[in-house]
């Protein structure tokens, strides 16, 4: 733990700054550390050495929560991930998980949503709204009036082979999401959404803050399978307190989703958090420029086996047993300014010698 903390000393200063307030109100300085602090890591791919590094920083800072946005396994659900669940139970910080595309199969077997929920979601602590047991849930943080919603991007369990299981939000989850957001509207909760993939991809080189790499290499450069923006459309209605009525037909499966909802007042959406693309892609959705998406590169840096998962599709060099073997983010949430401070722990210098250490992004503001 000590080595990880010492070699990231600059990042740790920025994390401290990200959670600090220094505001004068009625002649007094406001509470100095009242911001929500979040750790976001993704695509661990069974790299337990680097996972221990993530845990070291989580335990050192005690953020409000941490979330891993999918692909715990090295290749598929034949891989043993019990170590992850054993270790997060030992942490005082609540750590959550999303289902990734690599979890959805075991060799040639396509796994049901119920099976995925039992293996990757049910072991988590203090989750709510998971009555259906199909990979999605939420967690409330009353002290901040924030709800974290975790989605299952891969509901299409009826595919004949696993490589046809693309991003699809089906009717039941869409209805559940609307009902969950209506509770937030009623109770005045702001919303964050975590999932393996973003509802719409942030294009490469689309961010001036430095946290969006220039290219999206194969196979992540193929046309996005998520041709519909069901979640983003619903969030837009939630943000602006308006109605949404639409029918969506997924081209791969032919499945139809009917959305007919109305929100009565404007509500606060903070951001999406996702991974999957093994690169940094922070920016705003092209369809909704006021919806911020925080896409993080993979936390794993596994040089053994078929490739170095951290290095091959990212503009960041990832060298085992150095500071660059790690790559994960901390976020400080400023609800008053509607601003998120992003701080990188680990690899933060790209191939152009540009530093990717910190940046600030507004959210929920019309552009």
Question: What do these predicted ranges mean?
Answer:
Residues 2-83:
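N-terminal active-site segment of His-dependent metallophosphoesterases
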Residues 28, 59-65, 147-149, 161-287:
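His/acidic metal-ligating clusters that form di-metal
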Residues 43, 70-71, 100-101, 151, ...:
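Active-site glycine-centered loops adjacent to acidic/histidine catalytic or metal-binding residues
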Residues 2-22, 32, 286, 306-367:
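A short C-terminal boundary segment appended to hydrolase-like catalytic domains
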Residues 45-46, 103-104, 153-156, 197-201, ...:
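Short, solvent-exposed loop/turn segments at secondary-structure junctions
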Residues 78-182, 217-222, 230-233, 237-240, ...:
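Extended active-site neighborhood of metal-dependent phosphoesterases/phosphodiesterases
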Residues 38-40, 66-68, 97-98, 193, ...:
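Residue-level marker for buried hydrophobic side chains located in beta-strands
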Residues 25-33, 139-142, 261-263:
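Short boundary motifs at domain starts and secondary-structure transition points
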């Amino acid at each position: 733990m000590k080595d990880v903390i010492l070699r990231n000393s600059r990042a740790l200063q920025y994390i401290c700054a990200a959670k600090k307030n220094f505001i004068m109100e009625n002649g007094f300085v406001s509470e100095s550390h009242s911001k929500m602090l979040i750790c976001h890591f993704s695509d661990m791919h069974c790299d337990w050495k680097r996972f221990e590094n993530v845990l070291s920083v989580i335990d050192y800072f005690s953020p409000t929560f941490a979330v891993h946005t999918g692909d715990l396994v090295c290749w598929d659900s034949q891989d043993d991930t019990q170590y992850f669940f054993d270790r997060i139970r030992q942490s005082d910080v609540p750590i959550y998980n999303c289902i990734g595309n690599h979890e959805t199969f075991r060799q040639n077997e396509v796994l049901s949503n119920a099976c995925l929920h039992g293996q990757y979601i049910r072991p988590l602590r203090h989750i709510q709204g998971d009555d259906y047991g199909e990979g999605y849930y939420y967690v409330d943080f009353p002290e901040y009036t924030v709800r974290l919603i975790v989605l299952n991007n891969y509901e299409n369990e009826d595919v004949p082979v696993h490589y046809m299981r693309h991003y699809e939000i089906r009717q039941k989850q869409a209805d559940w999401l609307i009902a969950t957001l209506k509770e937030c509207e009623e109770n005045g909760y702001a919303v964050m959404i975590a999932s393996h993939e973003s509802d719409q991809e942030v294009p490469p080189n689309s961010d001036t803050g430095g946290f969006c790499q220039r290219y999206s290499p194969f196979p992540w450069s193929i046309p996005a399978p998520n041709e519909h923006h069901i979640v983003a459309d619903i969030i837009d209605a939630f943000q602006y307190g308006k109605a949404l009525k639409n029918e969506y037909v997924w081209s791969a499966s032919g499945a139809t989703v009917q959305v007919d909802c109305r929100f009565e007042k404007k509500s606060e959406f903070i951001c999406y958090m996702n991974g999957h693309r093994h690169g940094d892609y922070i920016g705003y959705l092209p369809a909704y420029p006021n919806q911020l998406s925080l896409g993080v590169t993979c936390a794993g840096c596994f040089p053994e086996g078929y490739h170095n998962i951290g290095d091959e599709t990212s503009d960041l060099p990832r060298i085992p047993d150095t500071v660059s073997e790690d790559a994960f983010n901390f976020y400080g949430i400023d609800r008053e300014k509607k601003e998120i401070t992003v701080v990188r722990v680990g690899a933060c210098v790209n191939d152009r010698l540009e530093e990717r250490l910190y940046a600030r992004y507004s959210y929920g503001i019309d552009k």
